[in-house]
Amino acid sequence: MRPEVQQLLYADETGELEGVFEVQVMDPVPVDRLPGVRSLIGGEDVVAWSHALLVLLGWGDEVGLVEAERIILGRIENPFDGVDTHRLHGVDLTFDNIAHALALGLDLNGLSHDRVRALAERLLQMSGSVFFQNGLESLVTALADPSLTEQTEGAISGLIEAGKNREASDLLPALAVLDADRAVRMIERVLSAEGLSRITALGVARTYARMPNASSKRELELIEAREDLPGANSFARRTLEDWGNAQP
């Protein structure tokens, strides 16, 4: 990748090369970079193209949103397949990354709620066949749109039925934002299918954290006590501390 492209995509306010995320969240958006980043869309360097898309979405840019619509709504084949893969599982992260970027652009720079919601609807439909880590959950949470409730619940249900309990638990916190009662029911389904295990516990804990009540407190205390659930137990502990209920 050419040095000038690296500066466009990865340099922070001081010119130090950092990463895509650091550029996505720059405040204010460096408008002088917009023409250069836009010019990378559709270019021969697929890595630069994919990262330019993520940057533009984070900045709330129309060119980025149009490109995301083309890819997610199936108007073109996914041009980024294999560009960024999960370091452990080797699965493609294209749509997870785009979902994260859409959430950032919505939160930070005013991407169109209605257009982003339409993309979220399509991504929820794709959740059984495309890998999502936390990107889809972040996007549905950022939208916090009640019209997505049934579809989010349906996506979680489909993942459970397909035996994808990790992915189901990762999406649970978004449902808690939309409908706490449904989230509790889906937690019960995940636990019935998988139990409270290393692959489900963090998602379950994050879901309880979004429903601050006495019942959630009890469940988080149980997770906190589970030494066999690293990550989830420390998250539960931090949540309880934030609630002013840390254990001695």
Each language-model region and where it sits:
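Short inter-helical turns and helix N-cap capping residues of alpha-solenoid HEAT/ARM repeat scaffolds
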Residues: 44-45, 75-76, 128-129, 163-164, ...
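Structural detector for internal amphipathic alpha-helices that build alpha-solenoid repeat scaffolds
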Residues: 7-29, 50-60, 81-110, 133-146, ...
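Long hydrophobic alpha-helical segments typical of transmembrane helices together
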Residues: 191-247
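Short, surface-exposed loop/turn motifs that are enriched in glycine and acidic residues
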Residues: 88, 125-126
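Amphipathic alpha-helical scaffolding segments comprising HEAT/armadillo-like alpha-solenoid repeats
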Residues: 2-5, 28-42, 62-82, 110-124, ...
